[in-house]
């Protein structure tokens, strides 16, 4: 009799604990790539300007160190000598709304508003000013800022 009671108890226990019918878990809905991607930068529409990054044996500098361009122009920064160099902008020294535009138009940033390091001579870093608001954009070379390597781009409409 004890065996029958034991078997019956086990059958009840198995029935009570097992076989819950759960709906299969659904994977979270995928976010479309268009929602995740940053806003596309406007296409450049203007002139291309060249700025050389140089060391003349005494000083590090951008040539030219000041430049006036139009919204839509592109500036190519060339590592001519004395590298590595980069170009970075002070967030508090650019026009309102410019940080978002530069963020979209500066490829391979090391950090916000700071372009990639150009370690190879003759390397070029291009920045489009498409959609850039008018005003002054003060920039510098991170490795050589303490040695005075800085400049300014003025964007006109």
Task: Enumerate the predicted regions with their spans.
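Extracytoplasmic copper-binding redox domains, predominantly the cupredoxin/blue-copper superfamily
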Residues: 18-157
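C-terminal motif of bacterial Sec signal peptides marking the signal peptidase cleavage site
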Residues: 13-16
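Sec-dependent signal peptide recognition
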Residues: 2-9
């Amino acid at each position: 009799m004890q065996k029958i009671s034991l078997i019956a108890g086990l059958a009840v226990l198995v029935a009570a604990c097992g076989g819950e019918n759960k709906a299969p878990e659904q994977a979270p809905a995928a976010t479309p790539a268009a929602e995740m991607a940053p806003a596309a930068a406007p296409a450049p529409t203007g002139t291309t300007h060249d700025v050389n990054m140089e060391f003349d044996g005494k000083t590090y500098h951008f040539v030219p160190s000041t430049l006036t361009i139009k919204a839509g122009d592109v500036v190519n920064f060339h590592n001519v000598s004395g590298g590595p160099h980069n170009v970075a902008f002070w967030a508090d020294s650019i026009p309102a709304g410019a940080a978002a535009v530069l963020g979209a138009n500066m490829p391979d940033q090391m950090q916000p508003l700071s372009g990639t390091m150009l370690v190879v001579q003759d390397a070029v870093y291009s920045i489009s000013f498409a959609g850039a608001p008018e005003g002054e954009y003060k920039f510098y070379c991170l490795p050589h800022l303490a040695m005075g390597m800085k400049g300014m781009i003025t964007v006109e409409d």
